[in-house]
Amino acid sequence: MINQGPVITIDGPSGAGKGTVSQLIAEKLGWHILDSGALYRLLALAVSHHGMSSDDVETLKVLAEHLDIQFQQSEEGKVEIILEGEIVTQAIRTEEVGNCASKLAAIPEVREGLLLRQRAFSQSPGLVADGRDMGTVVFPSAQIKIFLTASAEERAQRRLQQLQQKGEAVNLGGLVKKIKERDERDANRAIAPLVPAAGALVIDSTNLTIEQVVEMIFAETAKAGLV
């Protein structure tokens, strides 16, 4: 694997704040960003669109390798995600798609199919990679590895606020249950389980602001001589 620039990996469970933190760090450094979770969500949406079975692992692998996706920046500066010619930026963020993506991520052939696509994001001047196995599998030689976590209750509360802002009626208790189930599935899968990478800085964001987390990671970046 040949990296085209330095890499910061930010791994952790759903709702820990990886996406927001990664975007802010990437903007601050002027680096590229990889939202690996979006790739699995895109695959889940494509599987649904094509009426495919999650048991047909070889077909899933081929779909993962050849998924027709684009990331385009809008005039407002936001990144629009396009699947097979259709803008799906919001469609991939539903709970249903997220749960399906988590199940697909437990299939070794699917992870293998997406591996090279993820590594291709590593380009100069640098990359901030957000996911669950960025530091352990996808970019094991990354210069900085972060494992960002928070309590299940805090992550459920954050997700509740996001969904309520979208006008969705959700139950906090149900969200906590789903998050704990997903945590267990991610941590116990046979391939690329969700664990901190060797040498990773573990940050518990339960009682921290986004700004505090960003400053902690930026301090590590400066200490490593990357800025």
Curated annotation (Swiss-Prot):
Gene3D superfamilies: P-loop containing nucleotide triphosphate hydrolases
UniProt EC number: 2.7.4.25
NCBIfam families named among the record's database cross-references: cmk
Binding site for ATP: G12, P13, S14, G15, A16, G17, K18, G19, T20
UniProt keyword annotation of Signal present: no
Broad class of the protein's primary localization: cytoplasm
One Pfam family recorded for the sequence: Cytidylate_kin
One biological process term in Gene Ontology: pyrimidine nucleotide metabolic process
Molecular functions per Gene Ontology: ATP binding; CMP kinase activity; dCMP kinase activity
EC class name: transferase
Keywords assigned: ATP-binding, Cytoplasm, Kinase, Nucleotide-binding, Transferase
Claim: Nuclease is one of the keywords in the record: no
Catalytic activity entry: CMP + ATP = CDP + ADP; dCMP + ATP = dCDP + ADP
Recorded family membership: Belongs to the cytidylate kinase family. Type 1 subfamily.
Subcellular location: Cytoplasm
Lineage of the organism: Bacteria, Pseudomonadati, Pseudomonadota, Gammaproteobacteria, Oceanospirillales
Protein name as annotated: Cytidylate kinase
Highest taxon of the lineage: Bacteria
GO cellular component: cytosol
